[in-house]
């Protein structure tokens, strides 16, 4: 195949897709460039299904190569290792809009790999990578109802910006990624600075309109390439078996879905299917496979739940479509933590803990474009017991990393600036029960735990998950969805924000045909639910604590002359090491002279501050100091009046009367008051006890130690 290349202007960038030159043994391969950011995306599919396979094994791996930015990895081995959080999140971003477009019953393994080969600091590779995945899938011939397009939308000076640069995003009130087909939006991921529902919906619509040129370009590329489609057909439906299973299970399933408690309902449904499987197998050696029964069973469960809701009946747990589950809140639940909250909504519960730290505790990130640190971290954990199951416990899975990032996005807009609250903040959400919307429970609990820790947030933030059931022209938007409603529904729509507006939005749609009107209904219904939750949160904890926990570090910030930094650090770090050990503090000094002292006790912090001020203080001629006699000489004594500031007390300046022997009046280690008479060009000091005795003793502010 000869190389084929297509280019368009996309926003203020040139978007190019090439195929036919690199990775020709992959089933589909494209090089996508957006200005100087270049991504190679490949697709390979297995033409045979593994025996007993009952799910679609799609894998998406996004990889950032350090050479793409002209860097060598900072690890010991000097090569790329386990995927970073950014790589995992981008892999999920690509996966979410393409997964719904594979046909039902397609269980062949498919792997998408996106490798960043060249990285422009101003252009994130996630949009080119998503576009590349769409193009490579179309070229592969694998059954896929695409192509899709993707766009990033910013909001600057009340105008939408298509594919803003990194610099533009720094002043944008919105960072939204949208992906979809020619007809429908499939995925939205965003963080915002308390924007209205209308602005957010407008951004989604704007991005979807703009991406149509990308979809057209991919279609043109496929036409020129001459794609050979796979010879795959879905399995024929066994209508007699479907009818038989429906007769055996439908009535009992309807009764089971009226059970409000998740564990009881799950057990009842499991028993129904075990009975059905046994009856279908009775008297036959072959009979239908368990996989076939599961597929028919899922469709039957979906039909029962969906039709019940569309017919105006109560939801699974007896609620109406707009009702939020009962909420209970406790804060300050853990005595030794810096802040904690227990947020329970129905059968979903999150125990959220905040820990405050210093600049040294900030997360150091080795990214493509250089190292940087983040003062706010949010980690989400969901152990298997949260759903009444057994399972692996260990490093976080992709889902946990994605949910943590969503909750973090929701809270970023209300965090206090570092000048106002100088702590590093780590929030950990331990999901102890899960029946839908655990990430949004983490948002609510995270907000309360931060306020319990004394973080002065700009406003309360609450999150809520919305669902959708759509059949033809009939649809129902569901507030605060359950796990089963998420599983059997058509949309998972998570919205977080304050009373003023939205701070984070995530939408995943499983079907095509979601209109702007439906999204508008969902957003307005989500606002109604969000405000309800915010009212309950405010009643529980109206404002942040006045002070941080007694177990949290105390932070003192001040500035010194940058030229004096070396005096505080000392030779080989000796001075600052002694300061931290003797005062029990942690001391950080920036190049601009900013000093941050963290200590468990106020006394230790103030002592460290006082000693640093003494070290960096300039000696003033005519001022009286308390000094320590360091050494006796025949003609006087060497006296230290400030750390590193020694002067000569001549024998004639010790007393008004004649002094025959210095030792008769002074001894080493003695504390005396002296006045600075003179400081020469070389910094040598001439001191006097006689002059000091005629004036008032120095106060602590005047240098007393």
UniProtKB/Swiss-Prot annotation:
Keywords: Cytoplasm, Magnesium, Metal-binding, Nucleotidyltransferase, RNA-binding, Transferase
S1 motif domain: residues covered: 622-690
Superkingdom to which the source organism belongs: Bacteria
CDD domains with a match to the protein in the record: KH-I_PNPase, RNase_PH_PNPase_1, RNase_PH_PNPase_2, S1_PNPase
Catalytic activity: RNA(n+1) + phosphate = RNA(n) + a ribonucleoside 5'-diphosphate
Subcellular location: Cytoplasm
Keyword Transferase recorded: yes
SMART domains cross-referenced by the UniProt entry: KH (SM00322), S1 (SM00316)
Residues binding Mg(2+): 486, 492
EC id: 2.7.7.8
A Pfam family hit: PNPase
PANTHER family the record matches: POLYRIBONUCLEOTIDE NUCLEOTIDYLTRANSFERASE, POLYRIBONUCLEOTIDE NUCLEOTIDYLTRANSFERASE 1, MITOCHONDRIAL
Entry protein name: Polyribonucleotide nucleotidyltransferase
Organism per entry: Nitrosomonas eutropha (strain DSM 101675 / C91 / Nm57)
Taxonomic placement: Bacteria, Pseudomonadati, Pseudomonadota, Betaproteobacteria, Nitrosomonadales
């Amino acid at each position: 195949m000869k190389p084929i290349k297509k280019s368009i202007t996309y926003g203020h960038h040139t978007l190019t897709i090439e195929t036919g030159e690199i990775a020709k043994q992959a089933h589909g391969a494209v090089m996508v460039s957006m200005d100087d950011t270049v991504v190679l995306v490949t697709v390979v599919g297995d033409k045979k299904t593994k025996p007993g396979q009952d799910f679609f094994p799609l894998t998406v791996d996004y990889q950032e190569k350090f050479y793409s930015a002209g860097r060598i990895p900072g690890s010991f081995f000097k090569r790329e290792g386990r995927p970073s959080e950014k790589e995992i999140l981008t892999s999920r971003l690509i996966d979410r809009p393409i997964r719904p477009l594979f046909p039902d019953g397609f269980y062949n393994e498919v792997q998408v790999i996106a490798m960043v080969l060249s990285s422009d600091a101003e252009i994130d590779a996630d949009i080119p990578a998503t576009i590349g995945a769409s193009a490579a899938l179309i070229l592969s011939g694998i059954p896929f109802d695409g192509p899709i397009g993707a766009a990033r939308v910013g909001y600057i000076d009340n105008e939408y910006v298509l594919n803003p640069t990194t610099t533009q995003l720094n002043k944008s009130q919105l960072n939204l990624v949208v992906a979809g087909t020619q007809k429908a939006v499939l995925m939205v991921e965003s963080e915002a600075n308390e924007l209205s529902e209308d602005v957010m919906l407008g951004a989604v619509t704007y991005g979807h309109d703009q991406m149509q040129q990308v979809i057209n370009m991919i279609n043109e590329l496929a036409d020129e390439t001459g794609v050979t489609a796979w010879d795959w057909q879905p399995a024929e439906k066994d209508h007699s078996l479907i009818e038989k299973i429906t007769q055996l299970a439908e009535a009992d399933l309807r009764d089971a879905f009226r059970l409000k408690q998740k564990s009881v309902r799950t057990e009842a449904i499991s028993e129904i299917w075990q009975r059905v499987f046994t009856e279908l197998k009775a008297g036959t050696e072959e009979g239908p496979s368990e996989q076939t029964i599961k597929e028919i069973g899922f469709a039957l469960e979906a039909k029962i739940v969906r039709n019940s809701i569309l017919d105006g009946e109560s939801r699974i747990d007896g609620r109406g479509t707009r009702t939020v589950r009962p909420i209970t809140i406790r804060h300050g639940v853990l005595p030794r933590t810096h802040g904690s909250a227990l947020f329970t909504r129905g059968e979903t519960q999150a125990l959220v803990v905040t820990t405050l730290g210093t600049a040294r505790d900030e997360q150091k990130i080795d990214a493509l474009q250089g190292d940087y640190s983040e003062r706010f971290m949010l980690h989400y954990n969901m152990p298997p017991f949260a759903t009444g199951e057994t399972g692996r416990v260990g490093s976080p899975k992709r889902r946990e990393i994605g949910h943590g990032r969503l909750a973090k996005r929701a809270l970023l807009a209300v965090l206090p600036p570092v000048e106002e609250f100088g702590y590093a903040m780590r929030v950990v959400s331990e999901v102890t029960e899960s029946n839908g919307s655990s990430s949004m429970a983490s948002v609510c609990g995270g907000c309360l735990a931060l306020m319990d820790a004394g973080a002065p947030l700009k406003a309360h933030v609450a999150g809520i998950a919305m669902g959708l059931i759509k059949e033809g022209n009939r649809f129902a938007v569901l507030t605060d969805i359950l796990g089963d409603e998420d599983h059997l529904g058509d949309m998972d729509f998570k919205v977080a924000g304050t009373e003023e507006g939205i701070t984070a939005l995530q939408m995943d749609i499983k079907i095509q045909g979601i209109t702007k009107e439906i999204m508008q209904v969902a957003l307005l219904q989500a606002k109604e639910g969000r405000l309800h939750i915010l009212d309950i949160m405010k009643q529980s904890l109206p404002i942040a604590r006045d002070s941080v926990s007694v177990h949290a570090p105390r932070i003192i910030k001040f500035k010194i002359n940058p030229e004096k930094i070396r005096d505080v650090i000392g030779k080989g770090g000796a001075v600052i090491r002694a300061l931290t050990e003797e005062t029990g503090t942690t001391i950080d000094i920036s190049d601009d002279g900013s000093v941050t002292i963290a200590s468990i006790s106020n006394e230790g912090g103030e002592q460290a501050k006082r000693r640093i001020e003494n070290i960096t203080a300039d000696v003033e001629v005519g001022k009286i100091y308390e000094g320590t006699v360091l050494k006796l000489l025949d003609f006087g004594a060497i006296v230290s009046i400030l750390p590193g500031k020694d002067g000569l007390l001549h024998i004639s300046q010790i007393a008004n009367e004649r002094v025959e022997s210095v030792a008769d009046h002074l001894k080493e280690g003695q504390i005396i008051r002296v006045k600075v008479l003179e400081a020469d060009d070389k910094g040598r000091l001439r001191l006097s006890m006689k002059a000091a005795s005629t004036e008032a003793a120095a106060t602590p502010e005047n240098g007393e130690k």
